[in-house]
């Protein structure tokens, strides 16, 4: 029973302590092609998913939007210049990107002030895979909750 001051009025309640923020989560939907990874993603609650990173979706967006990709829509909130440096470092350091000849992108990508990445073509699944990996790594750096889909078919 709450205590009452001497005048009989109810004591003021102390402000509620806010719940601690949820811990960021990383979820991986993995399996061979056609195993239902994308289907499972559509059945999960959005609050469970966080940001969803899918190389197939990245490839489609690059093709549909002439090489542009909104990084804020993918959960990235760092300064554009820092994100661009991180993307270029990832491409430079990735043996997979080197094998694919993606070093041609170095110095040729831009990110505008609202976080839209512009990448020169051609736009294919290999480019999308490297970008998806770089985006996942950036989300990890930023401490964001996210889910990604992968076939886990390569050590790279």
Where are these regions (language model features)?
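Hydrophobic positions on the alpha1 helix immediately C-terminal to the Walker A/P-loop
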Residues: 40
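N-terminal pre-Walker A segment at the start of P-loop NTPase domains
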Residues: 2-15
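Phosphate-binding P-loop
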Residues: 15-24, 139-140
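Short hydrophobic/aromatic beta-strand immediately N-terminal to the Walker A/P-loop
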Residues: 26-28
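The conserved Walker
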Residues: 32-33
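Conserved glycine(s) of the Walker
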Residues: 36
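ATP-dependent NMP and nucleoside kinases share a basic, alpha-helical "lid"
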Residues: 140-142, 151-156
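Conserved substrate/cofactor phosphate-moiety recognition/catalytic segment
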Residues: 44-141
